[in-house]
């Protein structure tokens, strides 16, 4: 067999091959649009030249503190400039950024710090109580840097002598950072919600982050210089990679410390916000704003919404208010959104019920994803594309995680058969669009955050008066879903709903506490298995 001429003497070399990374997006934006506003935070403004310089200073300062390739830098930050800077400054050293969910409780944060072997922690003073409590519990003893927000001062305790702005000032503005030697190198670490025990550490690589950044711009319709409002927490899947996406098109980041109606309307009106993302809580907050909180919106604002699909009434109200909606679906393991409900123009000719049905579907694969399907998890065969046969939603491609940190067994299980197993059950239609039907792990998605029903049930079961309990999702216009607990009490014992809720508040992060407690017989099969599908129907009327 003669050699393939296209393989002869045509080799990869530095001239024709460089590892993909989102880091060079910022370098280019600073070169081409040095004076364009990159970040707005209160009265603070940073141009792209300043943004790039601050990231280089951060990288330099971290290097001076001993941070290098393969080290983990953890952050407990709100959607503020340091969070954006960490997305570039940390990986500029070959280090890995670990963003911590500020809504977690201290034991989970301590576990993450230990599991990640965190070498340095940047913490906002708003979250000082959480960080301090976690550090007491953790074996890891990272160096600490405090962020004192000059725009929204916080009264939390300062945990170290190192102030973030002083750290930035100490860095070299001309620091020569390095491209990753391999695009497969880790760039960030995100933890799952820990639905079956301790959370798993999801590792992203430079290649996936770069491709996801491009894909976001395509799917969100972002042209040059969009204005993006940070209603989505950047600790969640690295803000779906939008911290990097905006540098591709030299967009403006509008930081939002708290998701509040007045601040959102002011940002949209004053800064000309063109795009924002988030869970249904963002939409309900906008819609439920008082007249005093509202501002007229005279331009198109595109909203990417994910998590549990909001009620049709919310979608209709958002559209009537002038927002353009796009439904997305994904997981921590897929860098955030991996499917998009691409709207076809012919659907506009459907009646209201038909259009509503189309909106409930999770959609087709993201442009950066190589394959999306629904398989029978036992046979690994594709289910019929009939919109009725249920299987497991599975993904394949470059925006699937590298794997789970220090968990070879879980990684192998997740990738069994050459597909990433989502754990979500759904159907696929003849046009290739998928729709979720259930979550095999009974995850409750509230305000964009995953809540394990098992974790909540475990806490309730520990109450001495509880005989049986089950926790399911109850639809909620504001949060998307909230936990609803069904409880059977032990004979001759009593407990009120308020008592059980107080019990939960002492043992769970606040957002995980059920909003409703229903005292009723918990339906079970003949073998004793709780029938959660029945409870979900009951919860709708609870």
Pin down the residues of each PLM region.
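Structural core segment of the AMP-binding/adenylate-forming
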Residues: 64-65, 92-169, 491-493
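Conserved pre-ATP/AMP-binding loop-to-beta segment of ANL
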Residues: 34, 145-146, 157-165, 169-191, ...
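Conserved AMP-binding/adenylate-forming core of the ANL superfamily
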Residues: 17-18, 23-27, 35-80, 84-88, ...
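AMP-binding/adenylate-forming catalytic core of the ANL superfamily
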Residues: 104, 111, 121-125, 276, ...
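Conserved AMP-binding/adenylate-forming
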Residues: 269, 301-303, 310-328, 332-434, ...
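Adenylate-forming
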Residues: 78, 123-132, 232, 259-263, ...
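Conserved structural elements of the adenylate-forming
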Residues: 52-60, 169-174, 188, 202-223, ...
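Conserved AMP-binding/adenylation subdomain of ANL enzymes
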Residues: 210-227, 235-275, 289-290
């Amino acid at each position: 067999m003669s050699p393939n001429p296209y393989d002869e003497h045509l080799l990869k070399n530095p001239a024709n091959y460089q590892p993909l990374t989102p880091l060079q997006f910022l370098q280019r934006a600073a070169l081409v649009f040095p004076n364009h506003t990159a970040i707005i935070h209160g009265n603070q403004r940073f141009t792209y030249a300043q943004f790039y310089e601050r990231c280089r200073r951060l990288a330099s300062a971290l290097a001076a503190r001993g941070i290098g390739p393969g080290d983990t830098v953890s952050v407990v930050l709100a959607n503020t400039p340091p969070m954006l800077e960490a997305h570039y400054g940390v990986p500029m050293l070959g280090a890995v950024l670990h963003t911590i969910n500020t809504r977690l409780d201290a034991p989970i944060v301590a576990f993450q710090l230990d599991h990640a072997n965190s070498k340095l922690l940047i913490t906002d003073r708003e979250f000082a109580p959480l960080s301090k409590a976690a550090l007491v519990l953790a074996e890891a003893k990272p160096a600490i840097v405090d962020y004192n927000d000059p725009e929204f001062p916080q009264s939390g305790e300062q945990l170290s002598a190192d102030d973030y702005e002083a750290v930035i000032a100490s860095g070299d503005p001309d620091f020569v950072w390095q491209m990753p030697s391999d695009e497969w190198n880790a760039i960030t670490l995100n933890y799952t919600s820990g639905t079956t025990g301790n959370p798993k550490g999801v590792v992203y690589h430079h290649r996936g982050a770069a491709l996801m950044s491009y894909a976001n711009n395509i799917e969100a319709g972002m042209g040059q210089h969009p204005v993006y409002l940070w209603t989505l927490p950047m600790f969640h899947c690295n803000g779906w990679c939008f911290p990097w996406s905006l540098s591709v098109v030299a967009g403006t980041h509008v930081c939002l410390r708290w998701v509040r109606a007045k601040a959102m309307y002011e940002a949209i009106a004053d800064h000309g916000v063109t795009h924002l993302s988030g869970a249904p809580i963002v939409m309900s907050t906008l819609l439920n704003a008082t007249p005093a909180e509202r501002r007229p919106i005279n331009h198109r604002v595109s909203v990417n919404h994910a998590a549990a699909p909001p009620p049709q009434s919310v979608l209709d109200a958002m559209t009537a208010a002038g927002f353009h909606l796009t439904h997305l679906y994904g997981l921590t393991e897929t860098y955030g959104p991996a499917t998009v409900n691409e709207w076809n123009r012919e659907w506009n000719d459907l009646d209201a019920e038909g259009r509503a049905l189309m909106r409930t579907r999770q959609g087709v694969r993201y442009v950066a994803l190589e394959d999306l399907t629904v398989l029978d998890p036992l046979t690994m065969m594709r289910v019929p594309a009939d919109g009725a046969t249920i299987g497991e939603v599975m993904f394949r491609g470059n925006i699937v995680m590298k794997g789970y940190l220090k968990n070879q067994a879980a990684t192998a299980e997740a990738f069994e058969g050459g597909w990433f197993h989502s754990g979500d059950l759904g159907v696929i239609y003849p046009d290739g669009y998928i729709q979720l039907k259930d979550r095999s792990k009974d995850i409750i998605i509230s305000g964009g955050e995953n809540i394990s029903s098992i974790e909540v049930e475990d806490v309730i079961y520990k109450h001495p008066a509880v005989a049986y309990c089950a926790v399911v999702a109850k639809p909620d216009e504001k949060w998307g879903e909230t936990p609803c607990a069904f409880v059977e009490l032990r004979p001759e014992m009593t407990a009120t709903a308020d008592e059980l809720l107080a019990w939960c508040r002492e043992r769970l992060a606040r957002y995980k506490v059920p909003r409703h407690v229903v005292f009723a017989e918990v339906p079970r099969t003949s073998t004793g298995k709780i029938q959660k599908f029945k409870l979900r129907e009951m919860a709708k009327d609870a």
